[in-house]
Amino acid sequence: MNGLQEVCSSSGSVMIGLPAEEDENAAHSSEDSSCPDESVSETELDLALGLSIGRRKVRSSLSSSSSSLTRESGTKRSADSSPAAASNATRQVAVGWPPLRTYRINSLVNQAKSLATEGGLSSGIQKETTKSVVVAAKNDDACFIKSSRTSMLVKVTMDGVIIGRKVDLNALDSYAALEKTLDLMFFQIPSPVTRSNTQGYKTIKETCTSKLLDGSSEYIITYQDKDGDWMLVGDVPWQMFLGSVTRLRIMKTSIGAGVGK
């Protein structure tokens, strides 16, 4: 059509005085514009689908990241809690571990008892030894003191003999023993003692008889008392004689005839 045409589209828009080509273009544009709702709806659908897919991706990424964070935090917590657990376990193991068995405890107790017993025995033995040593020392000292106190050495001289001698009066118990001792010292001097003459010396010692006390001999025994007076041996009891004698002398009878008178 060469004239003006009126075209009414579905949208109600009117186009006047357009040529045919323009009319076709207008028809196409009208068709395109006749379905704006469908294009919009498709676009919205695409957008909605894209958004939903994006949201799902975001949610999945968020969930994966959160799960990874949760795992990491759990790993860190487990790693942090493992030293504490290990320390607690170490403490629990260190205290009272390994346990002592009954036989070991008994052996330790018996060993301690044996050591204590040995120590007590050794200390007791040491105490007894010390005590015995002290007692022995005391006894030795007592014997030494007793011997030093009780030994009563008295000098004895004889007329005509230059060398004097000493006799222990406490070793004797009577005048007869003193007489025999002086007789052996001055009158019956044995030869040097050997195996051959030992028996002879014993025989002389046992069988020798003296008459120094009865006055029938050439010599008599006198003593000097604490006052310096000379007296005849045998005129007083033996114990009194021991308490007063200071010196002994064997005199000739002719010289000592007036002694003690």
UniProtKB/Swiss-Prot annotation:
Disulfide bonds: none annotated. Keywords: Auxin signaling pathway, Nucleus, Repressor, Transcription, Transcription regulation. It is found in: Nucleus. Residues 1-43, 62-90 are annotated as: Disordered. The keyword Nucleus applies. Residues 151-253 form the PB1 domain. Aux/IAA proteins are short-lived transcriptional factors that function as repressors of early auxin response genes at low auxin concentrations. Repression is thought to result from the interaction with auxin response factors (ARFs), proteins that bind to the auxin-responsive promoter element (AuxRE). Formation of heterodimers with ARF proteins may alter their ability to modulate early auxin response genes expression. This is Auxin-responsive protein IAA10. The gene is IAA10.
